[in-house]
Amino acid sequence: MAILAGIIAYAASTFLVTGPARPGWLDSWFYIALELGAATVVTARVVLRPIERTAWGSIAGALYAVSLSDAAGAAAAATDRPAADVLDMLAFAFDAAFFGLAFAGLVLLVRKRLPPSTASVWLDGVIASLGMLSIASALFYRAADAITVASLLFLVYAVAPLVLVAILVGTAAALGRRPSEIWVLCTSAFSLMAVGNLIQATGLPWAVQPGSPVDTLWPLAALLLVAAAWRSRSTPRPVGSGSSVVLAIPSVFTLGALAVALVNQFTSLSYFSIGTAVVTVMAGALRLLFAVRDADRLRVRQVELNVSLGLARDAA
């Protein structure tokens, strides 16, 4: 409750206390304290509950990495060069650690929720993941005519949360059923992180200045991960009933990737958007071949069943 109250207070301050009158500690140490608080609550869950301990421990480590990255960034802003450059590199290293730990945690969570499946089911997840990355990157990323270190860092910063969302979207497609409450909470959390990064990546003055409403998204996302961690109480099993909307996800993202390729004929998109669109369409074509194969196998089985029923009727 204390973390929730702190997040509400911080969110209100982004509207009520702006400009030169805004104290610097609100956007540095108070903000970092909110992130550390969320990470600590997830860590407490890891200590107290053995279920999925490694997975949630990785996610707790990811939240700590975000806090340390922001702390290094705040220290860099108050330090002169060359120490500031070292702190900036340290902040980037912690950002990379966040992605690695969050990725590992999600993979561990997803692996226990996906039963042994056919190649078609896994391909549905790949199509949904790559298609979402292609569409989102086409909407938000600038074209990269020349690949530089700065453009690569920009791409990593903007893409990392999207990759985490893509894993969860792909999981929903692979399950082929209505996702669980844990999935909804995790997807909402990483989606908020992705939206925050995408808005800040636009470079709009109101979005990049300290204390903007966008800054509230990351602590709120951390709070959703806290809720997901503590709601996970038993051995995970795929739950829910079949959902035609979820089953249609691969087709929707394949069409979206085709749209990205079409838009590229009229305007220059990033290499990342084009590449993921091409791979998505190729995976969609392969999925169509699998569907034709499965339909043919079903037809053969139906014929064999009819023959068997006819023989049984004649024998009777």
Language model features with spans:
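Polytopic alpha-helical membrane-helix bundles and their juxtamembrane interface segments
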Residues: 1-316
